[in-house]
């Protein structure tokens, strides 16, 4: 999903999953 892609991008940038990502 788009949300999953955004989560992966953010995770790659900050090195951890954002709180709104499973």
From Swiss-Prot:
GO terms for cellular component: extracellular region. Disulfide bonds join 7-21. The keyword Disulfide bond applies. Keywords: Disulfide bond, G-protein coupled receptor impairing toxin, Mast cell degranulation, Secreted, Toxin. It is found in: Secreted. Its main location: secreted. GO terms for molecular function: toxin activity. Expressed by the venom gland. Potent mast cell degranulating peptide without hemolytic activity. Shows potent histamine releasing activities on rat peritoneal mast cells. Its mast cell degranulation activity may be related to the activation of G-protein coupled receptors in mast cells as well as interaction with other proteins located in cell endosomal membranes in the mast cells. Belongs to the sylv/frat/paul family. This is Sylverin. It comes from Protonectarina sylveirae. The lineage of its organism: Eukaryota, Metazoa, Ecdysozoa, Arthropoda, Hexapoda.
């Amino acid at each position: 999903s788009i949300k999953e892609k955004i989560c992966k991008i953010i995770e790659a940038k900050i090195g951890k999953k954002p709180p709104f990502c499973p």
